[in-house]
Amino acid sequence: MSWAALLGLLAVLLLLLLLLSRRRARRPGEPPLDLGSIPWLGHALEFGRDAASFLTRMKEKHGDIFTVLVGGRYVTVLLDPHSYDTVVWELRTRLDFHPYAIFLMERIFDLQLPNFNPSEEKARMKPTLMHRDLQALTEAMYTNLRTVLLGDSTEAGSGWQETGLLEFSYNALLSAGYLTLYGVEASPRTHESQAQDRVHSADVFHTFRQLDLLLPKLARGSLSAGDKDHACSVKNRLWKLLSPARLASRADRSSWLESYLRHLEEMGVSEEMQARALVLQLWATQGNMGPTAFWLLLFLLKNPEALAAVRAELKHTVWQAEQPVSQMTTLPQKILDSMPVLDSVLNETLRLTAAPFITREVMADLALPMADGREFSLRRGDRLLLFPFLSPQKDPEIYTEPEVFKYNRFLNPDGSEKKDFYKDGKRLKNYNMPWGAGHNQCLGKSYAINSIKQFVVLLLTHFDLELGSEDTEVPEFDLSRYGFGLMQPEEDVPIRYRARL
């Protein structure tokens, strides 16, 4: 062996000894500490491979709170839903989401905003997504869903069309959402402008989808050289498609877009960075609706009883309306709010497939009180992680047969929404958490729910839809998506559909 090789080996051994000598020890009052067997890396490989399975094993070993070493970071994981409120409503001076959000914003979207304050941004966006302008957004989304779905079906004719269910759902919802938030070709609309809207929004979707597929690797910094080149090309294309200059000529732009662009200009953000911010917002506002609709429709197609119940509810609701759905230019909120069966199906779908990480950076040494009276010390500089996918959403103590889709799980016997779920004999406040909670709950929740329900209504009233094969199975999750919102399937599910004449 050469001297160079020996020196290299010695350096590696010295580095390992240094890392081992600096390994953290658990202090009195702290959660159980699990460092794994690999210095510095700790459990990073297991966590990245399948976070849900890894955290399930850790919970079985240590209980509902523990600290693990993951790639040089100490992450305290809390899996007691009774104690979540303590975390999600804690002051930012103690537990803060912002540093992690800024880290992901820069790593995934190459976005740097001067004096960025997520709380101020949320306050600016809240009226345009939740209260003042929600009705206008909902009406515009319905119009654009009709443009995307019914225009395509008219052009395609009455025959059966074959595609993938995820491709179909994701394309329709993101395309319509893009037109709703970022504007349309012309107003008033013509057949020609609507055809251009379909082409342009489909281009946005297919380009965005390429970035979406790379998102987990971008977040973890694990892109190959080829992936990096592809990601760079896709981002540049999206920045051009969503540049403020290109969007300036679009009609019927949402008040959300106008308000957000004013906010960026007031911060002194360059047009280049504004385009990057708009790509980020496209993902934040639209990235989960398509996958949600995919799982919801798949569960309905695999469960005839559930599909029949939704159809019966829709028929009853529409019968009470003043005109048939096929003639409605808008779907009134009172109709959307009168679908408890569809609401239960949506909640059950989200329970089974929504798997975001709720993270906070520990800004100061603090004591974390648990709902059962215990108290644990957290260290400044660590990260705190909640994973509601494991508990409450898949907790067998809360839900019987938690792996099974039950369309009426969130319905009481009288047909009203069920909200009473229990763990350890106590009623849960947080029994299903697909939208986050506390200071960082999703602002677009109502808009997203309305959009998904409108999509399902249009699909069931205007199309025949069936699986490509009777023995189609529900696909496994793409395990790399844990932590990023809605799970996506390992592979798409073939379907066929046709417009009803």
Swiss-Prot record:
Substrate binds at residues 107, 113, 288, 359-360, 383. Gene3D superfamilies: Cytochrome P450. The chain crosses the membrane at residues 1-21. Keywords: Endoplasmic reticulum, Fatty acid biosynthesis, Fatty acid metabolism, Heme, Iron, Isomerase, Lipid biosynthesis, Lipid metabolism, Lyase, Membrane, Metal-binding, Prostaglandin biosynthesis, Prostaglandin metabolism, Transmembrane, Transmembrane helix. Its cofactor is heme. It is a single-pass membrane protein. One of its GO terms (molecular function) is prostaglandin-I synthase activity. One of its GO terms (cellular component) is endoplasmic reticulum membrane. Its EC number is 5.3.99.4, 4.2.1.152. Belongs to the cytochrome P450 family. Catalyzes the biosynthesis and metabolism of eicosanoids. Catalyzes the isomerization of prostaglandin H2 to prostacyclin (= prostaglandin I2), a potent mediator of vasodilation and inhibitor of platelet aggregation. Additionally, displays dehydratase activity, toward hydroperoxyeicosatetraenoates (HPETEs), especially toward (15S)-hydroperoxy-(5Z,8Z,11Z,13E)-eicosatetraenoate (15(S)-HPETE). This is Prostacyclin synthase. It comes from Mus musculus. The gene is Ptgis.
